[in-house]
Amino acid sequence: MKRIMLFLATNLAVVLVLSVVLNIVYAVTGMQPGSLSGLLVMAAVFGFGGAFISLMMSKGMALRSVGGMVIESPRNETEHWLLETVGRQAQQAGIGMPTVAIYEAADINAFATGAKRDDSLVAVSTGLLHNMTRDEAEAVLAHEVSHIANGDMVTMTLMQGVVNTFVIFLSRFIANIVASNDDEEGQGTNMMVYFGVSMVLELVFGFLASFLTMWYSRHREFHADAGAAQLVGKEKMIAALERLKMSHESQLDGTMMAFGINGKRSMTELLMSHPPLDKRISALRSQQY
């Protein structure tokens, strides 16, 4: 219940902040909210603003959502190994030392998040630590470090911002046309039609746009695998992916899943955030990304 309330409060705060920003933009530019340019600005503020605020808050939100425990002073040999391995890989990749955390989960997984290359988070599940060899776990950590080094969080946020902007703009634009054709029904009915149509269209356009964002996510996974192979060797990365084929399905959600080592299965590859494991293994063996 606390987690739900925190989620709702956070989203309400984001909406209020973006509303204030939008009104300031309108006041400074003299732009009319009901104009086409005003609609586009509103879509951009909420489309990009929401995506970037989520990115800025991603470390804290990710840790809270999975109940992650940050390793500050290693309490055992495993935690010491995690810090030492991530630190060495971060130095090799030319990034700052990420915050390292462990979270309780049966699935073999890990994820990276954070707004900056030098202020990021790498978290691993207890399932990964219990079920993978050190070589396999090292490859998974290298995969996450590669995501950070490649700047995948920022590029995915930029893409999501563009997608959000067009989804909001097109939905509201079409809804406005539909509602304006019902002038004889009265102002109250027009507003209901407008919001009803815009909500339906946002769902439809958002679903269609997910094909693009998932394609890009799969594309970045191949490059993160390649980066991991450069850091620890191709055979270790292949061994880690082979191990994942026998694991539980990912329990991560949202951006954590997008930058995890293991994704959710889907009826169609087009809606998967990660390529099929066999394709990832084949790409590593052939070195074709």
Curated annotation (Swiss-Prot):
Pfam families documented for this protein: Peptidase_M48
Gene3D superfamilies per UniProt: Metalloproteases ('zincins'), catalytic domain
Residue stretches spanning the membrane: 4-24, 36-56, 158-178, 192-212
GO molecular function: metalloendopeptidase activity; zinc ion binding
Cofactor binding mode and count: Binds 1 zinc ion per subunit.
EC number: 3.4.24.-
Keyword Electron transport: no
Active site: 144
Xref: CDD domains: M48B_HtpX_like
Annotated membrane topology: Multi-pass membrane protein
Enzyme class: hydrolase
Entry annotated with the keyword DNA-binding: no
An individual GO BP term: proteolysis
Requisite cofactors: Zn(2+)
Residues annotated for Zn(2+) binding in this entry: 143, 147, 221
Superkingdom of origin: Bacteria
GO cellular-component term (any): plasma membrane
Family: Belongs to the peptidase M48B family.
HAMAP family with a match to the protein in the record: Pept_M48_protease_HtpX
Name of protein: Protease HtpX
Species of provenance: Vibrio campbellii (strain ATCC BAA-1116)
